[in-house]
Amino acid sequence: MNLHEYQAKALLKKYGVSVQEGILARSAEEAVAAFEQLGGKFAVIKAQVHAGGRGKAGGVKVVKSKEEAADYANQLIGTNLVTYQTDANGQPVNSVLVCEDVYPVERELYLGAVVDRSSRRVTFMASTEGGVEIEKVAEETPEKIIKVEVDPLVGLQPFQAREVAFALGLKDKQIGQFVKLMAGAYQAFVENDFALFEINPLSVRENGDILAVDAKIGIDSNALYRLPEIAASRDKSQENERELKASEFELNYVALEGNIGCMVNGAGLAMATMDIIKLYGGQPANFLDVGGGATKERVIEAFKLILADTSVQGVLINIFGGIVRCDMIAEAIIAAVQEVNVTVPVVVRLEGNNAELGAKILDESGLKLTSANGLSDAAEKIVAAVKG
């Protein structure tokens, strides 16, 4: 689950992180009121969407009057913002953040953190190259990225934060400010189950103060049950409609750009299924894992999700019966096909627990379902059916 910039800044501020002040506005009138509250001279208006690249897409602008503030807010609110991180439809702009103008600044830095799977620790990354995508820095000048692994038994130590501050070229009071900021960010990361954290840019102002001008936070969705306050702030309008529906039925669904829908039980088998579809010249339309303990109802909902994607021209169902029985899956497939009125080709591969009974149920259903004898056979058949 991602947070908006205004939500991320508010959360970090609770942990002592100095952030650029801003006021949320959901209308042009509120934007004008916010502009005047911030001094009425200069302000920065930022579209609140779950996507990077807002500045280049016209989602960030400096305004110098209340008329400009109203005009720009009107241009953004109620529209979709398309950036390099969104699809062609973009993300809906329901609000804007009217921020204090902190420019000019002396320098722009970068500070971020993730859970590093290889070291199994929270790893901080910092760079003198703030204001640009960290992926670009990693590709072109990786030597400019400073990394610090945090031992979970003792947490972030002050000396580690000081070492990063020195490496960033900070001096005097800036070092103390940075140590406080990094310590607060780590505490926020751990206590709120962050999956991702970024301050980009972390600006050094002309008076020497350090300030988080932008903030990005991703929360581990598996931890939302113990973060009720954060879960309540979830903006579902920013999420893929099918992925959101899938989460309600505990289905792991990720929309892709192909035309062959996939329904599989098990993440590893799902990835292998997508790979073999591509091997035979097809393009998967989704990743969908119904889980090891799939129920009949969940399978029906999974089928509905796949077919809700208008780009789907065929469906491959690949089930290995371990905990879940293949005959139950077969009954669910039949119920779904009858309920949804499927018009695209459907290829089914069943293996394992009650696979023969499942195949028999499908064969006797009278529906246009093609059975497959193996994974390669299934992929070959669905690709051929879609290509016609």
UniProtKB/Swiss-Prot annotation:
It is an enzyme of class 6 (ligase). Gene3D superfamilies: ATP-grasp fold, A domain, ATP-grasp fold, B domain, Succinyl-CoA synthetase domains. One of its GO terms (cellular component) is cytosol. Mg(2+) binds at residues 200, 214. ATP binds at residues 46, 53-55, 100, 103, 108. It catalyses: succinate + ATP + CoA = succinyl-CoA + ADP + phosphate; GTP + succinate + CoA = succinyl-CoA + GDP + phosphate. Its cofactor is Mg(2+). It comes from the Bacteria. Substrate binds at residues 265, 322-324. GO terms for biological process: succinyl-CoA metabolic process; tricarboxylic acid cycle. GO terms for molecular function: ATP binding; magnesium ion binding; succinate-CoA ligase (ADP-forming) activity; succinate-CoA ligase (GDP-forming) activity. Pathway: Carbohydrate metabolism; tricarboxylic acid cycle; succinate from succinyl-CoA (ligase route): step 1/1. Binds 1 Mg(2+) ion per subunit. Its EC number is 6.2.1.5. Residues 9-245 form the ATP-grasp domain. Keywords: ATP-binding, Ligase, Magnesium, Metal-binding, Nucleotide-binding, Tricarboxylic acid cycle. Belongs to the succinate/malate CoA ligase beta subunit family. Heterotetramer of two alpha and two beta subunits. Succinyl-CoA synthetase functions in the citric acid cycle (TCA), coupling the hydrolysis of succinyl-CoA to the synthesis of either ATP or GTP and thus represents the only step of substrate-level phosphorylation in the TCA. The beta subunit provides nucleotide specificity of the enzyme and binds the substrate succinate, while the binding sites for coenzyme A and phosphate are found in the alpha subunit. This is Succinate--CoA ligase [ADP-forming] subunit beta.
